[in-house]
Amino acid sequence: MELELSLGDSPAPVKATIAPTPVLIPTCMGDEEDLELVLGVRATRRDEQDDQTTCTQSSEEAMEGEEDETRPHGEAPVESLSFPLFVSSAETGSANSEMCTRGFDVNTRPADGGAEAGRPSSPSSMQEASTRQQVADQEAADDEDNGGGGARKKLRLSKEQSSFLEDSFKEHSTLTPKQKSDLANRLNLRPRQVEVWFQNRRARTKLKQTEVDCEHLKRCCERLTRENRRLQREVAELRGALRTTTSSYPPLYGLHHLPAAAGTVFRVCPSCEHSKVVAAAASESFSPRVFAGGGAPAAITAAAAVPSPGAGSPPSSSAALFGARRPHFGPFAAAVIPPVLRRQPSATS
């Protein structure tokens, strides 16, 4: 009976139906009880194949062996076995049916987690555990010999050892194997410890240098940012001033139309009284392109047409007029006013 109760502790109940076979009374021997369990498993397999619906019957009715005569012929009463393993359940029918089709070994007791934990391990597992422990101990010993246990145990150096290592680092940041062994023997340390100290010292030096470079770059960046902002303000001010100047003072018109010899000084002899010389000087000084009309002024044309007074004929009124009023040429300024538009001085002045 203990075997049957242990099988009933399984949390996965299944629905079982049995074929119309004679019901065995549980008071018989153990072999017959095993036969009753096998018949129940086979009946469950047939129930999955036929998909027949059954009803349950109490274990007391199964033990008494009562049969309902009102049922149609060919249908057998459904018995719920006394084992909780075969209690019907609609929710877990598929999973339990799969387990039943695989079959159960009724002669073996199901494994229990607590019992397994309490059992003594086999000799092979004990040997493997001891082997793993030995390997771990060997690795720990190797790390301790090579100085690799720094993460678990920090190296403590005296002041003399630290100062000597600092002086050695200032001389040589890296050590050769011979220097490393000599330094380790002198300081009563292992070569691995000396090597690790130098590695850490180089890392700290590099980190400090990186921090210094970072601060320097930050200052340079801030200075360049301020300079860039100042230049942008100056550019904005210059652009505003250029717009104001362009709108207030339009460009002068006609400066590119000035004669090419505007800066040249023209001087005429004051004792010259010949009108031809005056007309020639006027024609040489001013090109016809100065005037927008394209033609020479009427005064210059008339002056060019006046005959010379030294030709023997009496001077006419126009000749007397030009002879009395001799033009006076002086230096031209930047903004030159044509002499034809300037008031000519009198002869008495």
UniProtKB/Swiss-Prot annotation:
Gene Ontology cellular-component terms listed: nucleus
Major site of localization recorded for this protein: nucleus
Q: SMART domains given for it? A: HALZ (SM00340), HOX (SM00389)
Q: Which cysteines are joined by disulfide bonds?
A: none
- The record places the DNA-binding region at 150-209
Outline the segment boundaries, as ranges, of region: Leucine-zipper. Answer: 208-252
- Indicate, by first and last residue, each region the UniProt record lists as having compositional bias (Polar residues): 89-99, 121-135
Q: From the UniProt record, which GO molecular function terms apply?
A: DNA-binding transcription factor activity, RNA polymerase II-specific; sequence-specific DNA binding
Per UniProt, subcellular location reads as:
Nucleus
Keyword Magnesium in annotation: no
Q: Where is the composition biased (Basic and acidic residues)?
A: 167-183
Tell me the InterPro entries matching this sequence: HD, HD-ZIP_Homeobox_LZ_Class_II, Homeobox_CS, Homeodomain-like_sf, Leu_zip_homeo
Q: Which keywords annotate this record?
A: DNA-binding, Homeobox, Nucleus, Transcription, Transcription regulation
Keyword Transcription regulation tagged: yes
Tell me which stretches of the chain form a coiled coil: none
In terms of Pfam families, this protein maps to:
HALZ, Homeodomain
What does UniProt note about where in the body, tissue by tissue, this protein is expressed?
Expressed in seedlings, roots, leaves, nodes, internodes, flowers and embryo.
Q: Where is this region: Disordered?
A: 42-186
**Source taxon at top rank:** Eukaryota
Subunit-structure text = Homodimer. May form a heterodimer with HOX1, HOX2 or HOX3.
Report the function annotation for this chain: Probable transcription factor that binds to the DNA sequence 5'-CAAT[GC]ATTG-3'.
- Family according to the record: Belongs to the HD-ZIP homeobox family. Class II subfamily.
Could you identify this protein by its name? Homeobox-leucine zipper protein HOX7
Q: Which organism is it from?
A: Oryza sativa subsp. indica
